[in-house]
A protein has these predicted regions:
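HINT superfamily self-processing domains
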Residues: 208-261
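Active-site cavity-forming subdomains of large catalytic enzyme subunits
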Residues: 1-207
């Protein structure tokens, strides 16, 4: 984990934005070195990334930009959703990162069906069942998740079942109150991934930089060359003719202070 934080610092130092998925980290109350209820969960590690973003700015131009993703099945999701709220323990807050929640289709199906959703600890799932849940998506995730739920109160002891629709409402309340998290739909992203041979996509980054390569019918081109032009872009399943609009150049950074702090 510390190695990844160091990598994030190096990227930020050179002006890059950083996207990190923390879904493999043990949940709060998990085992550490054989001791039960020893893990502090994902929040302390997110706080380290938060402080790294502040300490290591983007070449002196602006504060570091870090987005932190957590999969919707992780036991720490409820606390993750409160991570930027004004109330609660300030020691478990991280206000300078951009949280993203990684959503799978199975969760949305359960929201629609008003069904239960099970939050689990990735460490216990891997130790007891040999399943690296963070790597699963689509039908593979649905099958793995079914296996996990069949082992509740057997091999899987650390879990919590919630109403899927209530959890989705919690997400929306958090978005209204804080503007975050933004949502990354993992199955949709990976179905549209033209480079599946390189592996799966665990989450998304913050934005598109000028040198980002875009697949067009003329090959991969830096998006800056396509600014304010029409191009045929591959959307994952077909070519789409789109107008690529540059939204701004050397935009000023504004700081807004509210009366309530």
């Amino acid at each position: 984990i510390f190695e990844e934080i160091t990598n994030a610092a190096r990227i930020s130092k050179n002006g890059g934005g950083v996207g990190v998925n923390v879904s493999r980290i043990r949940a709060t109350g998990s085992w550490v070195m054989g001791k039960e209820n020893a893990s502090g969960g994902v929040i302390p590690w997110i706080k380290l990334l938060n402080d790294t973003a502040i300490a290591v700015n983007q070449g002196g131009r602006r504060a570091g930009a870090v987005t932190v993703g957590l999969d919707i099945w992780h036991l720490d999701v409820p606390e993750f959703l409160e991570m930027q709220a004004e109330n609660g323990d300030r020691r478990r807050k991280a206000y300078d990162v951009f949280p993203q929640l990684i959503i799978v289709d199975e969760f949305m199906r359960r929201v629609e069906a008003k069904a239960k959703w099970t939050l689990v600890d990735p460490y216990e799932v891997k130790q007891q069942l040999g399943i690296e849940l963070a790597e699963q998506w689509g039908d593979g995730f649905a099958a793995a998740y079914e296996t996990i739920e069949a082992e509740l109160d057997k091999k899987i002891k650390l879990y919590k079942q919630v109403d899927a629709r209530e959890l989705f409402k919690h997400i929306m309340r958090s978005q209204v109150e804080t503007g975050m998290p933004y949502l990354a739909f993992k199955d949709t992203i990976n179905r549209a991934n033209p480079n599946k041979h390189e592996g799966y996509i665990p989450g998304v980054n913050l934005c598109v930089a000028p040198e980002t390569l875009i697949l067009t019918d003329r090959g991969h081109l830096p998006i800056i060359e396509l600014a304010n032009k029409t191009a045929n872009v591959w959307n994952g399943s077909e070519w789409s003719e789109v107008f690529i609009r540059q939204t701004g150049t050397n935009q000023k950074l504004l700081k807004i202070n509210f009366s309530n702090g």
